[in-house]
Amino acid sequence: MPEYLSIATHERIEMISIGSQLAELLRKKAEDGWKDGFLAVYSPHTTCGLTINEGWDPDVMADMESFLAARVPQDWGFRHAEGNSDAHIKTSFFGSSVLVPVADGRPDLGQWQAVYLCESDGPRVRTLRVSFLKEA
């Protein structure tokens, strides 16, 4: 049975670490005996993606935001004219899902890694679907 996370974003373009929310879901699942496998985290939004990247130095996410803003400006002159065309393109750089390994009830990421929600058309409240996959 999937769980759902609601994440409030506060800026038009924003990278938000969701590790603490995922850890809380894992704590609840561990109480039910689920400790090893994978979390499949999915964003059903076309202007908000997910990525796993550097989690220690916040300048990495700031650089990503600046890079995308420079390469895909909001006023580029898109044919899609709803005003958020750049957000659709930016989201495609990240994708709509990540698979997070879990060991002993905790995310088993690399030393510097973190899971990020990548907002491209905020501020909004985003809903993420989290599925728990047991190892065979």
Regions found by a protein language model. Give the residues of each.
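Active-site histidine-anchored catalytic micro-motif
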Residues: M1-A136
